[in-house]
Swiss-Prot record:
Residues 1-3 are cytoplasmic. It is found in: Cell inner membrane. InterPro entries: Periplasmic_diS_OxRdtase_DsbE, Redoxin, Thioredoxin-like_sf, Thioredoxin_CS, Thioredoxin_domain, Thioredoxin_ResA/DsbE_sf. Belongs to the thioredoxin family. DsbE subfamily. PROSITE patterns: THIOREDOXIN_1, THIOREDOXIN_2. The chain crosses the membrane at residues 4-24. The gene is dsbE. GO terms for cellular component: outer membrane-bounded periplasmic space; plasma membrane. GO terms for molecular function: disulfide oxidoreductase activity. Disulfide bonds join 78-81. It comes from Pasteurella multocida (strain Pm70). This is Thiol:disulfide interchange protein DsbE. Residues 38-175 form the Thioredoxin domain. It comes from the Bacteria. PANTHER family: THIOL:DISULFIDE INTERCHANGE PROTEIN DSBE (PTHR42852:SF6).
Length: 181
């Protein structure tokens, strides 16, 4: 066989093998969106960040108010964030406390977005450079963290938060934290 054919053939076989491994993981129930987080069971690693609307600065104390919180990392440039936004508004109307981090975004665009689509967040923090997202281990927006009233992370979800994700994954954890309060 010609040496020029070996490299593409080997590359093809590696790709087929990787695809097969992923199919097996999915068949065994592994969620391809599930991302391990070294922060589960640890305090939110929040640096001091500025409020999107005011000159206020916030730190870890906003997560230590004695009640569970959803921390939602989002951006106006993110189409999946747009898809989940209506559901976040619904959760906020139901009394779920949500704090947002506007990730790698321009403040003016974020303010307009929230004005046009509604603001589900009790507080919106700016993370224009993405440094806090990096501390949280964010791979991209949106990501949602379930945090207890002492500021400890209990769950991380990458991707849009919708009814199915809420019912099956996040709400049971959130409800346990509400009852524990």
């Amino acid at each position: 066989m010609n040496k020029k054919l070996y490299f593409p053939l080997i590359l093809f076989l590696i790709l087929v093998f990787a695809f097969a491994v992923q199919l097996l993981r999915n068949a065994q129930g592994d969620d391809p969106k599930a991302l391990e987080s070294a922060l589960i069971g640890k305090p939110v690693p929040l640096r001091t960040l500025q409020d999107l609307f005011e000159e206020k600065q916030y730190g870890i104390e906003i997560f230590q108010q004695g009640k569970p919180i959803l921390l939602n990392v989002w951006a106006t440039w993110c189409p999946t964030c747009y898809a989940e936004h209506q559901y976040l508004n619904k959760l906020a109307q139901q009394g779920v406390t949500i704090i947002g981090i506007d990730y790698k975004d321009k403040s003016a665009q974020a303010i307009k977005w929230l004005k046009d689509l509604g603001n589900p967040y009790q507080i919106v923090l700016k993370d224009e450079k993405g440094s806090n997202g990096l501390d949280l281990g964010v791979y991209g927006a949106p990501e949602t963290f379930v945090i207890d009233g002492q500021g400890i992370i209990h769950y991380r979800h990458a991707g849009d938060l919708n009814q199915k994700v809420w019912d099956e994954k996040i709400q049971p954890i959130y409800q346990k934290l509400v009852e524990r309060k």
